[in-house]
A protein has these predicted regions:
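Acidic, contiguous internal or C-terminal segments within carbohydrate-active enzymes
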Residues: 56, 131-171, 175-176
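Extended, loop-rich substrate-binding clefts of extracytoplasmic carbohydrate-active enzymes
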Residues: 27-30, 100-152
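Active-site pocket scaffolds in enzymes
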Residues: 68-70, 88, 242-305
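Beta-strand/loop-rich accessory regions of lumenal/periplasmic or secreted enzymes
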Residues: 78-106, 190-199, 203, 213
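Beta-strand-rich N-terminal accessory domains
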Residues: 21-82, 228-251, 292-305
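Active-site/ligand-binding surface loops and adjacent short beta/alpha elements
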Residues: 168-170, 174-251
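Hydrophobic h-region of N-terminal signal peptides that target proteins for export
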Residues: 13-21
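Bacterial N-terminal signal peptides that target proteins for export
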Residues: 1-9
Length: 305
């Protein structure tokens, strides 16, 4: 069969283009952990296949990482591996069955790489998780969990749950980002004025109304019932703002410890604020019928230094 030189040249160019299309997605090993780095003109990020945890995110031109990581963190980690953006699924907080781990099993399960794509508006990485013998020990359902990360002018995260079981399932979930800040006493969170809230250490009933901006200058574990899905974190120390916009969740959780906490030092506690899009508490759980899907999505826009 005769193939023209021009067709061969086109095929060669297509092969080169295919390589270039994924050149911004690189798999690496770091401290024995499988990691994937994404980099393009919009910035760079690093994600661990363990838990699909985004561990680092630096938009182009930013001097500091957007995400906090404690100096004591080891990537081999434990089930309470703090920092970055943990994925909390299929329950958030202590809302699983009695005796189960807080924040679900996705955060310490190994995800598979399902796809990677380069587009004009960003680099896209898709990760996935399906049931294993280990997950069935704590949650006896079939499911398909897909996590799509797009590094573009914004960082877009999409967590899609599909119920592949023959039974309905109830789910709470969320993302648990640790936002790195200059000093939490110089931070404010806007977009919560007028929201009903509760202090989760005390109650799960949102029966108080928040007024004005939130200043996380102590220990908080506050859960806000959203009236809008746009919150702004302003760091006066670094002149930086982080804006969260999204859908598919009903709450924002703000968590900060008072002083040292587990593997976090008192100094660590001053340099992060957790502002977490989530659906939590059992009465708020959503039910998926067999074959049904739900998507939690968050777009993160950063400006400043």
């Amino acid at each position: 069969m005769h193939v023209s030189r021009s067709r061969l040249a086109i095929s060669a160019l297509a092969a080169v283009a295919a390589v270039q299309a994924v050149a911004n997605v690189v798999r690496i090993q770091e401290e024995g952990m499988d990691m994937i780095t994404l980099s393009n003109r919009f910035g760079s990020l690093k994600v661990s296949l363990r838990g699909a945890q985004v561990r680092s995110y630096k938009p182009a031109g930013m001097a500091e990482d957007i995400l906090f990581a404690p100096k004591t963190t080891t990537l081999e980690g434990t089930k309470d591996d703090r920092g970055g953006i943990p994925v909390c699924w299929p329950w958030f907080g202590r809302n699983g069955e009695p005796g189960t781990e807080s924040h679900g099993f996705a955060r310490y399960s190994r995800f598979e790489v399902r796809g990677q794509k380069e587009k004009d508006d960003g680099t896209i990485l898709t990760l996935g998780l399906k049931p294993t013998d280990e997950t069935r020990k704590v949650w006896p359902y079939d499911f398909d969990l897909e996590y799509t990360i797009r590094l573009g002018a914004t960082l877009d995260l999409s967590l899609r749950t599909r119920n592949t079981d023959a039974r309905p399932v109830k789910i709470t979930e969320g993302l648990h980002p640790y936002w790195r800040v200059s000093d939490r006493n110089k931070v404010r969170v806007d977009g919560l004025d007028g929201c009903l809230y509760c202090f989760a250490d005390v109650s799960q009933v949102a029966d108080q109304t928040w007024k004005g901006a939130f200043v996380p200058n102590g220990h908080f574990d506050h859960v806000f019932t959203l009236t809008k899905h746009e919150q702004t974190i302003t760091d006066a120390g670094w002149g930086r703002t982080v804006v969260l916009r999204g859908s598919g969740y009903s709450k924002i959780v703000i968590w900060t410890p008072e002083g040292a906490f587990e593997n976090l030092t008192a100094e660590d506690a001053l340099h992060f604020v957790c502002v977490e899009p989530a659906t939590l508490f059992r009465p708020d759980a959503y039910t998926l019928a067999p074959g049904e899907e739900h998507v939690l999505s968050v777009s993160i826009a950063v400006s400043g230094k």
